[in-house]
Amino acid sequence: MALALAGGLATAGAAVAATSAQTAHLRHENFEQMGDAFKRVNDELGRGSPSKAKLAADAARIQKLSAQAPSWFPKGSGKEVRPKSLTLPAVWANPTDFANKMKAFQAEAAKFPRTVTAGDMEAIKAGAKSLGGACKACHADYREKKS
């Protein structure tokens, strides 16, 4: 019985580790998608006549991902399961500050699609800048600098 219980605990521990590793990988993949969407927005805004349809698609993508982002940071999903992770331990050490910054980012991400839909290009540019600033607010304290 004890051996079966120990085996069950080992299996449960492995499942949690696999889930944490999967979450860390998912977090990376989703932030890559978000970064790509930000790049497309900025590239589009740099064109002479930006496509509002392209901006709207990327704004919606950023909003959707931002709504999911808080679930990408469960305890145990840092470097301990994904050594290449850029997520700093401060995410879990300072959960209230991290959550507040995440909420501010989500609020900007929720506003941006409406700004794009309204169609005022100057407001869209200002909204993109504000959204980028809210995104970067987490980077200083919660993301390792890329080498």
Regions found by a protein language model. Give the residues of each.
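N-terminal signal peptide c-region/cleavage motif recognized by signal peptidases
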Residues: 7, 12-15
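Bacterial N-terminal signal peptides that target proteins for export
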Residues: 1-2
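Sequence context surrounding c-type heme c attachment/ligation sites in exported
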Residues: 21-54, 60-147
